[in-house]
A protein has these predicted regions:
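Bacterial N-terminal signal peptides that target proteins for export
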Residues: 2-10
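Bacterial N-terminal signal peptides
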Residues: 11-20
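Intrinsic low-complexity/disordered segments
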Residues: 3, 22-23
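Scaffold/interface architecture of coatomer-like assemblies
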Residues: 24-364
């Protein structure tokens, strides 16, 4: 009886010891997980009829190599704050003749306030190697003086070139200069929308040369610029006037022309309609010629691939400076797998609006 009680007391003591030695009961833990969503920003230009419309992410359809990507956000670039653009004016004196450098810089100098109205402006001169002549600035006066100074120096060379025609750059020089441009931009990763104003000439059509190397070099550079998000504005401003603007024909005009009977003289004379020229710069005959000039084909390809434009006359600049602030920024989800470094085709549509946005054609 005593042994049994002793064992009972011993068992109770062990149990109490275990209870006293056990850690106090902790409150249930709560876990928080941070979800890392990878996004890529793409700047697009919308059709004029969608300007000012309220759009949502579901209005956009983004295809990468033909496969849809989720659009997570969409908003006008103006919501990123006043003057959100990063502007880089890149004057290549090897790719551009003195005349092109003179007229292009002079035209930009006259729009210095429009440039700085977009955002910060940096001016780079590539004599052979690129170098910054004006660090990023938002002061219109500084930008104007810098560009006017470059135009003044180019004018002296242009006047000298009237008696000594400079030889165009060789295929090797074209490729080398574009490589230097890409290397210069590779060190820059601006946040938000960014545009490259490239002062350069085109090249002679391929049949006039032994190879198509310049076209290939421009094509490859254009794809890399597009994949980096640069909006390419190619400037090859000319001396001559763009011509007298022509009013576009209305549907009624086209119908009357198509149904008119040749040689008919009966009845009253047709009414004479006075119509104002269209607001589009394509109303200027020589502006249209820019896009069919074989020598400018490399620059046109650059502008197309990057959702930019080709400027050959200063009358085109006001429309450009009015259009850039109206662009939209959309963000698409990125795959979890690491980027493979290859270039992928990019298309941005608005199916509900039956429209397609102008977007960079390539993504990396």
């Amino acid at each position: 009886m005593t042994r049994k009680r002793h064992r009972s007391l011993l068992s109770l003591a062990v149990l109490l010891a275990c209870v006293d030695g056990a850690p106090a009961q902790q409150p249930p833990q709560t876990f928080s997980e941070q979800l890392d969503i990878r996004e890529r920003e793409i700047v697009v230009a919308l059709p004029d009829n969608l300007a000012g419309k309220a759009l949502r992410p579901r209005d956009f359809q983004v295809l990468v190599d033909g496969r849809p990507r989720e659009v997570t956000r969409a908003e006008p670039v103006s919501r990123e704050g006043p003057a959100p653009w990063t502007i880089l004016v890149y004057v290549d004196r090897v790719l551009a003749s003195p005349g092109t450098v003179f007229y292009s810089n002079l035209a930009l100098a006259e729009h210095a306030r429009d440039l700085t109205g977009l955002g910060s402006v940096e001016v780079v001169l590539a004599d052979a190697d690129p170098g910054t002549v004006l660090p990023p600035s938002r002061e219109p006066r500084q930008v104007e003086q810098t560009l006017a100074g470059l135009a003044g120096k180019a004018r002296i060379e242009r006047d000298r070139a009237r008696t000594e025609v400079p030889a165009p750059p060789s295929d090797l020089q074209v490729g080398r200069q574009l490589d230097k441009l890409l290397a210069f931009l590779a060190a820059r990763h601006p946040a938000g929308p960014h545009a490259l104003f490239l002062v350069a000439d085109g090249s002679a059509p391929a049949p006039a040369r032994s190879t198509a190397a310049p076209e290939t070099a421009f094509r490859d550079a254009s794809r890399l610029l597009a994949a980096s998000g640069w909006v390419g504005v190619a400037l090859a401003v000319r001396r001559d006037a763009p011509g007298t603007p022509v009013a576009p024909k209305s549907e009624l005009d086209l119908f009357e022309e198509g149904t008119a009977t040749p040689g008919a003289t009966n009845g009253p004379p047709p009414p004479i309609r006075g119509r104002a020229p269209g607001k589009s710069t394509l109303a200027f005959p020589r502006v249209i010629d820019l896009f069919i000039d074989a020598r400018l084909a490399p620059l046109h390809a650059l502008a197309t691939a990057t959702a930019g434009t080709l400027i050959g006359y200063d009358v085109q600049l006001p429309a450009l400076f009015a259009e850039l602030p109206r662009r939209w920024a959309i963000w698409i989800s990125e795959p979890e797998a690491p980027a493979d470094g290859r270039l992928h085709t990019l298309t941005v549509r608005l199916p509900r609006r039956k429209a397609e946005a102008r977007a960079p054609q390539w993504l990396r």
